[in-house]
Amino acid sequence: MISLEQVTVQRQGVIALDQVTHTIYPGQSVAVIGPTGSGKTTLLETIAGLLPVQSGNVSFADSSSTTDSPLNQQLIGFVPDGNRTWPMIRADECLELFAMNSGLRGKQIDDAVNRALEEVSLGNLRGHRIDTLSSGQSKRLLIARALLCEPHILLLDNPYAGLDPVGFQIIDQLTTNAQLTGRIILAVFNDANVPDNFTDLLVLNDGQKVTAGHFQPKQFTNVDKWGVRLKCPSSAAQAAKIIRHLTLSSTVVDDDFLTCYLPTNRGPIEEAVAALIKAGCPLESCTYDPPWPAQVLYSLIRD
């Protein structure tokens, strides 16, 4: 468990986190969103023990970050944003150095390096020099480094940036498996385009926690309307008429696509979908446009 109690953190004399209180439980995968400068990366670095806490407390079960370094306890794996400049050594040699620095010895190092490389599908490149890896492979090596000690907590800063398709699948699998293994995943997203396999959403603004809840649109009551895009092949105009009584406004984009705003106080999006199906109107897809976490964020900033 991660517990933050009235945590305040400064960066270069400016408050970056302002009395943030939040608890994250084993098995939760939490997506953190917010505008640029809202404190998202600062939150991760504070939990990782990389930034000092001015006031308040960060604790992990019975261990407080003010007295112990969670990274040294092999508790946390941290994947920073972007790629890093690596030494000109082999991939496996690089991980061996990090494993030793984490306190592993002898066979523990070999086992950890082999497992981490396989987990990110780099086992066949273990003997390659790091400077020969592609940017996507290099980002996967960062993930492997974070997984060396099988951490209970995995912190991901903008995890999909710079990843190749294999890396996308790895992050998705880690997130899905967290609920089964009890691992905590805390991931920062700069664009609020969050995959739906996360369990929770945390919104920051100006260094403060604005709202949080389970990863379901209905949990966020600050939104008064949802933007939706429907694909009704050759029937967009017909669809607009069918759900007119449920919408605040609608726009027929072309013969196939319709965008509309649905008020949250008239029922969920499923009601509009049900109305179209009942009327026999062809419906191929119905999606939030933009993604609903982004709409939650925009609504909070607007207010």
PLM region spans:
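Conserved ABC ATPase signature
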Residues: 129-133
